[in-house]
């Protein structure tokens, strides 16, 4: 979206990023008409627009190819008439003044044009020839309208460029106070340059608790120690009573696990597509992790089929009662449920599905195990169904959780005991029942949702110190909710927690505190004693 001298410009890809985009213009933002720009939109998926200042005649469009053509970079385009006509600048065949092995040309999107996209025009340049671009791993700059380019930053250190995190999404050039600042927003936060791109700093991020947490685990032997899996910021650890979470493993961080046994400390972290790394000791530094071995013949990481895995890798940690040895964990791919009994050194499938009716959904908390034993395991399937076993995986049943008002999109299962289960939905709308409950081991289901907000639920947690199974906590997109009557009524729980998306919950066996991780506002504790 950008405003030029002809009015507002906007681009739309009608079927996500798999259909040619359309450029629209509007004089007032109310009525819109298509702009014929075939050289710009043909074969395009996502398009990002930029102007130096509202009302400019010069506009830029940074264009990715449709994802059925690879989601790579199509080109950068310039318009000199407010958006009626566009000229391609030929970035994919243009070498920067400082090329390297990764970037011999100015192709910056790296096959992720659907995701990482940034273009900003320097408003202090009256010719509008100074432009900054960002893609997957790096940024670049031109001062002559795209004729020549220079690479500015890279996520990787081997190319001798200043560091800025990967995946660029937004930028601004500010001249407020008479001092020019270039600011770029990435998956790793905010990066600033005070010298027009020569050097960069990330110090404005210091002190901000704003990582996007997918999952969280707490040490069974030291409840103050916490692991978190972060969106594109790896696995981080808090060791002891501190506010600092240090990086323990890089890349995308998804499911994490930490044994609840007080006598045998093991831990797991994960990357994409079934890549689970593991530690047989307190994982307080990166060198204590062991990476999985990949078998090319079977496409497996220590037994987990990477070719069947989702981008997100979930991990379920049993209770100390169920696993006193502290070495058993569970995960899943699209059609398999896996178990390890040696803390991640090897995995074996305990369920293997082969049809769409038995696919397991790709969610952060898609597999769960009973707090009583290791035989009762469940995984959320498609169409509002769940997969259940009560004999450790020798036999499975597929049960529907659908009741009037509940349409599925199940995200999380909470076992209160071997008979009482709760299932939550992450459906963004169109239903009135967000949680369903079974008291007969999953054979039948009933609504258990009154009082919950009409927003997705990421995780359910049954209080381990309530043997009746009536106390359950819900991590919703609007904070934490609790029921103490088995789902007959829910209410928002606890004071002080921001009303934001809660991604995971933890409670020790004695129920002394509740810990919540959020998608952008850190980790929070609430004492219950």
What are these regions (language model features)?
Residues 1-529:
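Beta-propeller blade termini and top-face loops
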């Amino acid at each position: 979206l950008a405003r030029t001298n002809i009015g507002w410009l906007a681009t739309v890809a009608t079927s996500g990023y798999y259909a040619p985009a359309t450029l629209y213009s509007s004089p007032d933002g109310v009525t819109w008409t298509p702009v014929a720009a075939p050289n710009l939109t043909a074969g395009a998926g996502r398009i990002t627009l930029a102007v130096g200042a509202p009302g400019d005649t010069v506009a830029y469009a940074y264009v990715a190819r449709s994802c059925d053509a690879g989601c790579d970079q199509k080109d950068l385009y310039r318009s000199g008439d407010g958006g009626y006509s566009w000229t391609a600048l030929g970035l994919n065949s243009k070498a920067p003044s400082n090329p390297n092995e990764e970037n011999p040309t100015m192709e910056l999107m790296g096959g992720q044009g659907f995701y990482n996209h940034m273009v900003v025009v320097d408003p202090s340049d009256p010719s509008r020839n100074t432009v900054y671009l960002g893609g997957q791993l790096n940024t670049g700059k031109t001062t002559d309208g795209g004729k020549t380019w220079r690479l500015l930053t890279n996520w990787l250190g081997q190319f001798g460029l200043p560091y800025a995190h990967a995946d660029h999404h937004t930028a601004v050039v500010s001249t407020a106070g008479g001092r020019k600042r270039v600011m770029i927003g990435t998956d790793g936060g905010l990066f600033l340059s005070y010298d027009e791109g020569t050097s960069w700093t990330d110090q404005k991020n210091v002190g901000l608790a704003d990582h996007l947490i997918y999952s969280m685990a707490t040490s069974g032997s030291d409840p103050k120690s916490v692991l978190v899996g972060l969106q594109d910021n790896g696995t981080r650890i808090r060791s002891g009573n501190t506010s600092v979470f240090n990086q323990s493993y890089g890349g995308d961080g998804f499911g994490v696990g930490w044994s609840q046994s007080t006598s045998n400390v093991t831990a797991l972290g994960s990357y994409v597509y079934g890549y689970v790394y593991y530690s047989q000791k307190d994982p307080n530094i990166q060198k204590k992790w062991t990476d999985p071995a990949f078998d090319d013949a079977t496409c497996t990481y220590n037994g987990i089929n990477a070719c069947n895995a989702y981008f997100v890798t979930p991990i379920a940690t049993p209770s100390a009662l169920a696993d006193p040895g502290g070495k058993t964990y569970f995960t899943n791919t699209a059609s398999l449920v896996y178990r390890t009994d040696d803390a991640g050194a090897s995995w074996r499938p305990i369920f293997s599905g082969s049809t769409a009716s038995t696919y397991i959904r790709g969610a952060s908390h898609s597999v769960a195990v009973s707090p009583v034993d290791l035989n009762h395991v469940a995984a959320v399937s498609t169409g509002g169904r769940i997969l259940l076993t009560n004999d450790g995986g020798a036999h499975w049943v597929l049960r529907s959780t659908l009741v009037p008002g509940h349409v599925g999109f199940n995200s999380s299962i909470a076992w209160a005991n071997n008979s009482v289960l709760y299932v939550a939905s992450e459906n963004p709308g169109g239903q009135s029942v967000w949680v369903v409950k079974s008291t007969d081991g999953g054979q039948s289901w009933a609504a258990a949702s009154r009082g919950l907000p009409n927003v997705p639920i990421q995780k359910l947690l049954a209080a381990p110190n309530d043997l009746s199974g009536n106390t359950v906590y819900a991590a919703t997109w609007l904070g934490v909710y609790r029921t103490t009557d088995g789902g007959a009524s829910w209410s928002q729980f606890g004071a002080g927690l921001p009303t934001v998306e809660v991604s995971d919950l933890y409670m020790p066996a004695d129920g002394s505190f509740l810990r919540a991780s959020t998608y952008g506002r850190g980790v929070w504790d609430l004492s219950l004693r």
